[in-house]
Design a protein with these regions (language model features):
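Structured core elements
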Residues: 4, 89-93, 102-105, 184-186, ...
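Phosphate-handling catalytic cores of nucleic-acid transaction enzymes
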Residues: 289-296
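Conserved helicase motor "Helicase C" RecA-like lobe of SF1/SF2 P-loop NTPases
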Residues: 192-208
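Non-catalytic, compositionally simple segments
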Residues: 1-89, 100, 116-159, 166-169
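Metal-dependent DNA phosphodiester-chemistry modules and their immediately adjacent helices/loops
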Residues: 1-21, 203-289
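Feature representing long, continuous alpha-helical segments
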Residues: 54, 101, 165-172, 194, ...
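Short glycine-rich phosphate-binding loop at a beta-alpha junction
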Residues: 179-190
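Acidic, metal-ligating active-site segments
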Residues: 97-111, 274-281
């Protein structure tokens, strides 16, 4: 049976005198200078720490941490007035019929490196009705769903489920009312029925719908690129409070190779549906960027 060298406690990871426990070949097989560099990098970038603990100290990790800080994601810039956009690349999250659903449209202007995001959210009307019947002043999930509905940022669907057809209707609204045509729409193939997919294809064309497989192979690099664009304030989402809530709720899970994917926190009330919809759209945008930009 192979013997695994590891630290006695994860707290020893930044104590050079303890490193020999997990690295008996330190100084020969692995240079101390290399380990010092990796530890310092982890101190400067906490998201890198789980990688160091696993690869250099053999400490098992479930590497999960916040994807964006509030400083990263906060952007109060508003969208330009109507008529600024002609095409968009869409994405939507429809994973749960009895909960929050979201759709996004990435728009862009010629000569402008910012991405402008249009969005819509849906929730079952029963969620709000139950709250009113209970006289509960604290809204479910601790956020003001009723206010967001009254502000037009979110829509309700009658009953206890979201009829996912409303997502198609919203993209049709963009086309018919705002003259913004969806060039492509990204979707998770696990969470769309054949019937709804056929309806999208009938409305916009078979080639418009693009599968976005979930997991690190598809999402890792786009997540890293999108994070950088948020940090550079190149993602303009009209200061939408639901977007901010979903973004701040999003955590990233990192494997030992540094690949990342989005995950929900352990708290059920912390929704990330808006982030999931944006990522689906952004993955397609990255793959279709040249074609998209040639049309704007």
């Amino acid at each position: 049976m192979p013997f695994i060298y590891e630290l006695d406690d994860a707290s020893e990871w930044d104590k050079p005198e303890m490193w020999i426990k997990a690295n008996p070949g330190l100084g020969t097989i692995k240079k101390k200078e290399y380990l010092e560099e990796m530890v310092q990098k982890a101190k400067n970038d906490p998201s890198f720490k789980p990688t160091v603990l696993v690869k250099d100290f053999n400490i098992p990790q479930t590497a999960q941490s916040a994807w964006l800080t509030f400083e990263d994601l906060n952007n109060e810039e508003l969208l330009p007035e109507g008529g600024a956009f002609r095409y968009c690349i869409g994405g939507f999250d429809a994973a749960d019929s009895i909960d929050l659903n979201a759709a996004k449209a990435i728009c862009k202007r010629r000569g402008d490196d910012k991405l402008y995001i249009k969005q819509m959210y849906w929730i079952p009307q029963a969620v709000l009705d139950q709250q009113e019947e209970r006289g509960d002043r604290r809204e479910r999930d601790g956020v003001p769903y009723s206010l967001w509905v009254s502000q037009g940022l979110m829509r309700t669907c009658e009953g206890r489920r979201v009829n996912k057809r409303v997502i198609l209707d919203w993209f049709c609204e963009l086309r018919d009312r705002e003259d913004i045509y969806p060039l492509y729409i990204g979707y998770d193939p696990w969470h769309i029925s054949d019937e709804l997919l056929a309806a999208f294809e009938q409305e916009f064309g078979r080639n418009v719908m693009v599968k976005v497989r979930q997991g690190v192979l598809t999402l890792s690099q786009p997540m890293k690129d999108l994070k950088a664009e948020f940090q550079e304030k190149k993602i303009v989402y009209n200061n939408n409070p639901i977007d901010k809530w979903c973004l701040i709720n999003t955590e990233e899970k990192k494997d030992v190779n540094g690949n990342v994917q989005p995950v929900k926190s352990d708290e059920r009330t912390r929704r990330i549906d808006g982030t999931a919809a944006l990522l689906d759209a952004y993955v397609v945008y990255c793959n279709k960027r040249d074609e998209f930009e040639s049309l704007i």
